[in-house]
Amino acid sequence: MNRLLIVLLLVSFIAPAFRPVTPPAKTSGSASVLAPVAAEPVKLSWEVLRDVTFKKKWYAEESVYMLYPTFGQSIQKLNGKAVELTGYVLPVDLESNLYVLSAFPYSACFFCGGAGPESVVSLKFKKAGKKFKTDERRTFRGTLKLNADNIYELNYIIADAEMVEQ
């Protein structure tokens, strides 16, 4: 009797999971009422990326002082959001598909010309493959990630990056 009761209880909990799914109702057009709407990416500017301050912080693992970022409110609101950003492509390692997008051409970038760390963004591509040349001016779309703690990455990262065709 106890076994029968347990089986009946299990069936009553599991059975609803196997009911057929009814498709969502249609509107007068062809779109579904519950159709997801893709978020339009925010057109990010280098000016907005300047909403950050830096202070020197000691990193014992590398025995060096480095600049630690404190992101302003306007940039914090964009963390994890879809963005588009235009800049100059700087190849870091072609074989690893490692690229940086810079506010400035190579001769004036953060690495060579003395611009600040807020003027470069790491591109983490959704799909590897396309090769870019130094100083190609391109627009990329992806998810903005703010990085304050990983000293082996840049402060700004565009994850799942894709080039926007123009």
Language model: regions and residue ranges:
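Sec-dependent N-terminal signal peptides
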Residues: 4-13
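OB-fold and OB-like single-stranded nucleic-acid-recognition modules
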Residues: 18-166
